[in-house]
Amino acid sequence: MKKSASSPANTPALAALAKTSIPYRVHTYDNESDHYGKEAADVMVERLGVEPEQIFKTLVIELAGKPAPGESPLAVAVVPVTTTLTVKKAAAALGASKAHMAAVDLAEKTTGYVAGGISPLGQKRKLRTVIDESALLWDNIYVSGGRRGCCLLYTSPSPRDLSTS
């Protein structure tokens, strides 16, 4: 594991990655607004010179219909911060006809993270996850490290690893 000089306190996302052999690097910044995804993207672009399309946000959606036994009605969509999630497409990828954005308090309670810091990794309750196919275009992508102001440079041979960590 490689960390930046200003490493954050351990988060469940970092703990989940530490249990794997997937290389990653932690990048932190001072969070100064309520526009977490955009702010993170702006900071990472300026500080590291990365493409904004390499930076992914984690969105929690609620699927319509009754979930299978033991399955949550919530799911996670990981998409570039430069795009808007098409909720209907995410629902279809998860086998549902419809979905909507989950209420913030429900997303926070279920994942164990605060809005603006929800990570696809190390969630309190593991949710089904779909990842935008554009992740395949990059050797590295950035996702939330599990708190506001913490991004992970995530290097993996497969974005599918995001949904299993």
Question: Model-derived features: where do they sit?
Answer:
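Long, charge-patterned amphipathic alpha-helical coiled-coil/hairpin "stalk" segments used as oligomerization
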Residues: 82-146
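Short, surface-exposed beta-edge/turn micro-motifs
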Residues: 56-58, 71-75, 126-127, 138-140, ...
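Translation machinery proteins
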Residues: 27-67
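N-terminal, charge-rich interaction modules
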Residues: 3-30
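Single conserved hydrophobic/aromatic residue that forms the stacking wall/gate
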Residues: 154-165
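Charge-dense, helix-prone N-terminal extensions
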Residues: 2, 24-29, 48, 55, ...
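RNA pseudouridine synthases
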Residues: 59, 70-78, 89, 95
